[in-house]
């Protein structure tokens, strides 16, 4: 936010400008701390023979307060402006927010489960995290995160809901969960825009759970919002790795850094005898990462508790135990690559 000293540009203020500032100083700052002039929200006030102009800095204010504050300012200015044209613009310092795309070449590899648990693990580590369910045609984050509540809106912006310390939005919260979405590419891309451009406040990192494959939604995200990095999830089997390679190729073509590969469903321990089997193979993702020159972030075993936790709406990372520690370590590895 601009400081009070910098906010009042120009050393010589006319009496009319002083009157304008006095009128604006009667408006209480929405933060509850002083008025909008002393808080430095009034920038470059100027009164000429034909116009009254100023900028209003709304940095740090909830979007729901912007329109009411603008109305108050316009009303105050009208008393000074007379027949002059009023020129008022709102401005804000946008919080730098890093997008981490979580993708896969094909469905069924546990990408959404991994995305949700990474988001929760990062939130538990003290990060301010947002989670966007960009899997428009098959949104599963409301179930995994246990949050089907429909989000409110302020003006044209959605207001994310919070679950397990993570702000989240999903198209699954906005439509009937039992109805198919027969949307063409432009409609899906527009839906993604509504989710990404929501009022995320001071969110530092946004985890975006992408649809499987390399379609319109992926292209929209990569072209318009340029993720800081991408994480690709795959099972060890060759079929998944072939498709994962296509996702990696897309990220590279769009100049999005690959933070690393995660091997999911890596080994199954029999709950009765403890013997470990590898229904999807073993070590394939780590080998592929080495071959492609990509960092291997780690592996997650095929464990019934991870599946049941997601079905129950409480991601494993929100609990304590060995599996939660795995996601905590994965989150640390991703942050190390990102930084």
At which residue positions do the language-model features occur?
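N-proximal, solvent-exposed amphipathic alpha-helical segments enriched in charged/polar residues
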Residues: 8-9, 13-43
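Glycine-rich phosphate-binding loops of nucleotide-dependent enzymes
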Residues: 169, 210, 329
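C-terminal lobe/tail of nucleotide-utilizing enzymes
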Residues: 15-17, 39, 58-64, 68-71, ...
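Phosphate-binding loop that captures ATP/GTP phosphates
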Residues: 122-183, 189-190, 196
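Walker A/P-loop phosphate-binding motif and the immediately C-terminal alpha-helix
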Residues: 98-135, 248, 252
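Extreme N-terminal, non-catalytic leader segments
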Residues: 38-104
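Inter-motif core of Ras-like GTPase G domains
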Residues: 218-239
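Switch II (G3) loop of P-loop NTPases
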Residues: 172-186, 193-220
